[in-house]
């Protein structure tokens, strides 16, 4: 099943990641999700928010911080960034999870005539710029691998809000690409809307996972109910994230990708 989700608060959208992972495990089905998030900083499960996020700037701009269930560092989401998530009903290795989701991004870039490459295992670069980062959450019965794709996001906002961990470059742990983000619009000089990216990503997901299974609406309803509870009890709680608040659990519209509208 390939889903699209429209709107919703960052807290609910991240809660839905955990809920869909649980649905994948329980029902033994592969699910993919294409989605956008309003302005937010999404940090890894073990991220040190104080070291990775410019909290004062985030407060000044009204940007909430939300912690996801996967590892990795802090990333900035806005409506110019497309997210793709895949939920696989088995335990994958970290490298296998990264290879799966980066292949979807690379295939999408190839369809656009853009040459991309993987760096640092979980980044996709075009020239000297990072256009996509990915992370994974691995459980006993299912794996979540998700990635960003910077379409029109202003990279100066990322640099204002997310603190690059340059000591990792100095130690030789990662290449400088990891902390050199840029959007496809600025690299190519051509604007791509999210609905256009959704169409291309949908084809890339099918190439990676095969034709999606036809799953009933009851699984979607179960996922939304799970996410509703997770958002209320976990993801909107200030102590779980940061002192930033803005924890309203505003729900997105959730629909199969087969519906006629691609407007996200």
Curated annotation (Swiss-Prot):
Q: What is its EC number?
A: 6.3.1.20
User: Protein name, please?
Assistant: Putative lipoate-protein ligase A
Q: Which cysteines are joined by disulfide bonds?
A: none
> What is this enzyme's catalytic activity, as reactions?
L-lysyl-[lipoyl-carrier protein] + (R)-lipoate + ATP = N(6)-[(R)-lipoyl]-L-lysyl-[lipoyl-carrier protein] + AMP + diphosphate + H(+)
InterPro entries linked to this entry: aa-tRNA-synth_II/BPL/LPL, BPL_LPL_catalytic, LipoylTrfase_LipoateP_Ligase
Could you give the subunit structure recorded for this chain? Monomer.
Q: Which domain of life is it from?
A: Archaea
- Ranges for the BPL/LPL catalytic domain? 26-213
Q: Taking the first listed entry, what is the main subcellular location of this protein, grouped into a coarse class? A: cytoplasm
The note filed under miscellaneous reads: In the transfer reaction, the free carboxyl group of lipoic acid is attached via an amide linkage to the epsilon-amino group of a specific lysine residue of lipoyl domains of lipoate-dependent enzymes.
Task: Provide one Gene Ontology cellular component.
Answer: cytoplasm
